[in-house]
Regions:
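P-loop NTP-binding core
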Residues: 1-303
Length: 303
């Protein structure tokens, strides 16, 4: 909660007439900190008082696994976001949403069955099944939209129907990029393909209007000169679309991931204090800067 000028407190989330903010975190390349960014942002905003729904749209289900589930066992046949998206007898999204061990943070899990959505969508397009893939997630979210301030979607690392379904339900995008030549080349390819696909969809269904599109420099090592040069190159081209604060590369994040934890869950006594402080400042800095973008989408002034 925040404190007003007269000492009153108020929550930072939606107010009357504010739209639900649906944010897809995307990249074309695996290992670009998509899932790491998604779970840390979701947890940070839940801790800040936002009502958050995390949606795992990746059949690999890394985000679901990070919340302590074993998708290959617990969601082998049902109980995932696929159940709400499938073309034959879909269920309401509310039926598959799980509470997590974080207050204010719920999860719509994924599982391997979600990969079926790609082939089913191709079939549905041929046979003109309604609603089309362009609307399916948006319609599913609409059922529960009053329950949340933010939806954070972890997308798969390819530009298929699953990713496009997420992008078309979104109000804003966050693209993660590791500042290396290969990763930047991959991102450029992703953006070119996404642009062409979106243009085709707009010709068929009308304009797609996101509130914002931001880039997050991830797994950044400030002492790595080529990385610093590449980060500077990205900022020179993309300007203020690149978040000022990068997500640093840290052993604390990788160590936490080994036990399906985030840095917010680590036992401070198990980590070098300087290391933990450094990565907390980085992750919180990213989240707080991106929070300003969200607040601006609601038409609010930010610091």
């Amino acid at each position: 909660a925040k404190t007003g000028r007269n000492g009153e407190t108020y929550l930072p989330g939606r107010r009357e007439n504010d739209a639900l903010q649906i944010i897809s975190i995307v990249n074309f390349k695996g290992g670009s900190s998509k899932t790491t960014s998604a779970i840390h942002l979701a947890q940070r905003y839940a801790l800040r008082g936002y009502r958050v729904l995390a949606i795992d749209m990746d059949p690999q289900a890394s985000l679901t696994t990070m919340f302590g589930y074993r998708p290959e066992i617990e969601f082998a046949e049902s109980g995932t976001v696929y159940d709400a998206l499938k073309y034959e007898d879909p269920v309401p999204l509310s039926q598959i949403i799980r509470k997590t061990y974080f207050h204010n943070l719920d999860l719509a899990p994924a599982g391997l069955l979600l990969s079926e959505y790609e082939t089913e969508t191709a079939y549905a397009l041929q046979h003109k099944v309604d609603p089309p893939f362009t609307q399916r997630l948006a319609i599913a979210i609409d059922e529960i939209e009053a329950n949340y301030d933010l939806v954070i979607i972890d997308c798969p690392p390819q530009l298929g129907f699953t990713t496009m379904t997420a992008l078309l339900a979104s109000t804003g995008l966050l693209i993660t990029v590791v500042p290396s030549m290969l990763d930047v080349a991959s991102m450029a390819q992703f953006l070119e393909m996404a642009g062409e696909t979106v243009q085709t969809l707009e010709e068929a269904a009308g304009p797609i209007d996101w509130n914002f599109l931001k880039f997050l420099i991830a797994r950044y090592e400030p002492t790595d000169v080529p990385q610093s040069q590449m980060a500077g190159f990205l900022r020179s081209i993309l300007l203020d679309q690149v978040l000022t604060t990068p997500m640093l590369k840290s052993t604390a994040i990788s160590d936490a991931g080994m036990t399906q934890q985030t840095i917010y869950e680590l036992d401070p006594s198990q980590v070098v204090k300087k290391t933990l402080t450094r990565i907390l400042e980085s992750v919180n800095g990213v989240a707080d800067e991106f929070e300003n973008t969200i607040q601006q989408a609601w038409g609010r002034e930010t610091d």
